């Protein structure tokens, strides 16, 4: 690939970074990136066939939007160039982990309750849907939370079930540190497919 190589023609007016930081609602820029996470993992070399239930993208990792017209390799890199992997390649790698249904609901509550104060933690999800009431007490704002299947059907979340979640390394570390920052009040622990806590998230990086 070269920087000016055209990857796609775009006729969509994508959300701006300003909108993502000032409006607490679904944004098409976050949606397309989270959808791309799932596509990348399910088409990666060595994919084990376990479908991805949820992909999570926080607004703080999105560095640029896409304008109408040509979308080049450089445009894509600029939009998501934050961080570096242990392989030395720019951009945080994608990681694969598992969360319980209860933890997915907590992630939704974190977005509903905290992201207005910490806009970089605003979450854009593929597969996870929720509604909230901004006038309710903090950590009690979410009024409905569920998954969406491949055909758009509603899937109820089971609190004790493990769900396959894909995000980038930065986000995985951020979510995993919630328990430490809240002194255990909020518990959100990335796990492997057997439910064992993951000690080093970099070991879960998706490598093509």
Listing of model-derived features with the role each one plays in the protein:
Residues 1-208:
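Catalytic centers of hydrolytic enzymes
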């Amino acid at each position: 690939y070269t920087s000016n190589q055209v990857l796609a023609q775009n006729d969509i007016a994508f959300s701006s970074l300003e909108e993502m930081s000032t409006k607490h609602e679904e944004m098409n820029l976050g949606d397309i990136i989270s959808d791309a996470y799932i596509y990348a993992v399910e088409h990666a070399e060595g994919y084990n066939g376990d479908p991805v239930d949820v992909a999570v993208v926080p607004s703080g990792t999105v560095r640029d939007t896409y304008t109408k017209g040509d979308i080049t390799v450089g445009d894509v890199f600029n939009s998501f160039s934050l961080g570096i992997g242990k392989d030395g390649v720019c951009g945080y790698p994608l990681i694969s982990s598992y969360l319980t249904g209860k933890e997915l609901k907590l992630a939704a509550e974190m977005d509903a309750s905290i992201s207005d104060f910490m806009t970089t933690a605003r979450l854009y999800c593929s597969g996870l849907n929720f509604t909230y009431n901004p006038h309710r007490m903090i950590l009690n704002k979410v009024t409905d939370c569920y998954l969406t299947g491949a055909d758009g059907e509603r899937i109820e979340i089971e609190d004790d079930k493990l769900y396959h979640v894909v995000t980038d390394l930065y986000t995985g570390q951020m979510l995993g540190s919630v328990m430490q920052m809240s002194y255990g009040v909020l518990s959100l622990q990335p796990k492997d497919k057997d439910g064992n806590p993951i000690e080093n998230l970099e070991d879960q990086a998706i490598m093509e």
